[in-house]
Design a protein with these regions (language model features):
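Class II aminoacyl-tRNA synthetase catalytic cores and aaRS-like
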Residues: 1-597
Length: 597
């Protein structure tokens, strides 16, 4: 039966007990990590959020010793005892490895059943089981450390931004649904039957309205929601570090955020981030890396060989060029002897990313070539191609030929795959960069129209405003993303603050004047009353902390994450609700054809 802790007051957390306390009486509380019964002595590893402290029970203590025999993993206990230097071997792996507490008083505050998995880091437990018993999983030291790191990050950001003049303001979570972007999570209104709120995908419009309201610098640690397919770095509910600034341009936003990141990484990780961070245009990022979030910790950059092969005899290359495409390649240094089976796997990978195929050329150590297309080209053409690729004996050259979008996607993905396989990435590097000058619009084959690459409120570059009426594909945006080691940490833009440009932007995206005012009338009305130039940025907090913690999945830095089908294995959400609730909301559940069958 559980005992009360009445009369006991914790004097220290586990790792707060140190050599300085030798000879003193302490009161500590926590969970039983491990029990070792040596006959006349029982050793208990006591665990709390800070770490492990060794407790010792001696058979000479009679009643306390007998009670200690009952202890099992995950029992919650409170003890009083004296700190002493360890008699036996010192445990260098523990902060408290050279001391122990000889226990005089033991209270069992709560017993535990045998947990479904050991509460320790080095255990091979299925992730679904970990998430089902997340409250146990969260006791593990790594997750304790990760969530403490997350807390440290948000605390630092709030303090730094407050000193920079930012005001923290909360924006609504019950919002108006808008059609652009990912699917909304909808919330039915009981008071307005048949009408719905949307949970915010971001506080975008509200933070712009705060600039209209004169708050100058806004920040919020904001919860956001998107009903989209999950990946390793995506969740249906996530957290943004959201900010907006008035009377600024791109350089001002970049400056404050570079200083924030530099100070935060130094304070929390003791990592020096050099400033200024590199900047490259979106076009340069795609041409060099095949990605708008390039990992610059290694080379293997894309090379455009279109001009070199445009008149060659290989129809795959020339055909792609004649259809308005390009031919690009990557040089995989020192892999010219790669077995054909591995090359075939690369070809399959390329096809999986949209390629019709993948051409390769191996440069043998004697300078001769082994290639899938050598017979279609003259020796001079091959030599020129190898020269353009800076090929040397022992190298493997890979080529894709198609529309730019496909070639970038194929070679960008291959570049990352090969870098991981060949262990080319220095995991100790923190390579930040800014990608700027994004296209304002991108063509959607599915919708057969231009859509906003970022969102409809991004300001075009002034010199490209003329193309809003003539050629949307030429319009560049005053948009910027911050990238770390191949992951987009955040993105932002200078916003449109003139009503006429905003209306023209919405018109270019296919909104009628009536639709624009129905969806965004409150913003367009605000533009009638004096709007400062403004810009902003939002970080994905989960992704940022994931990188800082050295994790590969954001679920490892979120207390209660969802799985890939957006469900919670611990609470079984989402779940059916009773008919009375549905009636109050005037909702009928329509069964799909498969359910009816």
């Amino acid at each position: 039966m559980a005992e009360s802790m009445q009369g006991l007051h914790r004097s220290h957390r586990c790792t707060e007990v140190s050599n300085k306390n030798i000879g003193e009486s302490v009161t500590v509380m926590g969970w039983v990590q491990k029990r070792r019964n040596l006959g006349s002595l029982i050793f208990i590893d006591l665990r709390d959020r800070t770490g492990i402290l060794q407790l010792v029970f001696d058979e000479n203590d009679g009643e306390v010793f007998e009670k200690a025999k009952e202890l099992r993993s995950e029992f919650v206990i409170a003890v009083e005892g004296k700190v002493r230097k360890r008699d036996g071997a010192v445990n260098e792996d523990l902060a408290t490895g050279d001391i122990e507490v000889t226990v005089d008083t033991l209270r069992i505050l709560s017993e535990s059943e045998t947990p479904p998995f050991p509460v320790e880091d080095d255990v091979n437990t299925r992730e679904d089981l970990r998430l089902q018993y997340r409250y146990l999983d969260l006791r593990r030291p790594t997750l304790q450390k990760n969530l403490k790191l997350r807390s440290d990050v948000t605390t630092f950001i709030r303090k730094f931004m407050s000193e920079e003049g930012f005001v923290e303001i909360e924006t609504p979570t019950l919002c108006k649904s808008t059609p652009e972007g990912a699917r909304d999570y909808l919330v039915p209104s009981r008071v307005h039957p048949g009408e719905f709120y949307a949970l915010p995908q971001s506080p975008q419009l509200f933070k712009q309205l705060l600039m209209c309201s004169g708050y100058d610098r806004y920040i919020q640690i904001a919860r956001c929601y998107r009903d989209e397919d999950l990946r390793a770095d995506r969740q249906p509910e996530f957290t943004q570090v959201d900010m907006e600034l008035s009377f600024v341009d791109i350089d001002d936003v970049i400056d404050v955020n570079e200083r924030l990141i530099q100070a935060m990484f130094k304070e929390i990780l003791n990592v020096d981030i050099p400033l200024p961070m590199p900047r490259i245009s979106w076009q340069e990022a795609m041409d060099r890396y095949g990605s708008d979030k390039p990992d610059t910790r290694f080379g293997m950059e894309l090379v455009n060989v279109t001009d070199v092969v445009k008149d060659c005899g290989f129809g795959v290359f020339t055909g792609a060029i004649e259809n308005g495409g390009t031919v690009r390649g990557i040089n995989v240094k020192g892999q010219g002897a790669m077995p054909r089976k591995k090359i075939d796997k690369l070809v399959d990978s390329a096809k999986g990313n949209g390629a019709k195929g993948l051409a390769y050329l191996c440069i043998n150590e004697d300078g001769t070539y082994k290639s899938s297309f050598a017979k279609f080209m003259t020796e001079e053409e091959l030599d020129n191609l190898v020269k353009e690729m800076k090929g040397e004996p022992g190298d493997l050259l890979l080529f894709a030929a198609d529309r730019n979008k496909i070639v970038w996607n194929v070679l960008g993905a291959l570049r990352l795959e090969l870098a991981e396989t060949l262990e080319l990435i220095d995991k100790n590097k923190w390579n930040f960069l800014w990608v700027v000058e994004f296209p304002q619009f991108e063509w959607s084959d599915e919708q057969e129209r231009f859509i906003a690459m970022h969102h409809p409120f991004t300001m075009p570059m002034e010199e490209d405003l003329k193309y809003l009426d003539t050629d949307l594909g030429k319009v560049r945006a005053k948009a910027y993303d911050i990238v770390l080691n191949g992951t987009e940490l955040g993105g932002g833009s200078v916003r449109i603050h003139q009503a006429d440009i905003q209306e023209k932007m919405l018109e270019a995206l296919g909104f009628t004047q009536e639709q624009a005012h129905e969806q965004f009338g409150f913003l367009l009305d605000a533009f009638k009353y004096g709007v400062p130039p403004h810009a902003g940025l939002a970080y994905g907090l989960d992704r940022m902390v994931m990188h800082m913690a050295g994790e590969d999945n954001i679920r490892e830095v979120i207390a209660f994450p969802k799985v890939k089908d957006a469900s919670c294995l611990m609470t079984s959400a989402p779940s059916p609700v009773d008919n009375k609730q549905l009636e109050e909301l005037a909702i009928d559940i329509v069964k799909s054809e498969t359910e009816e069958a």
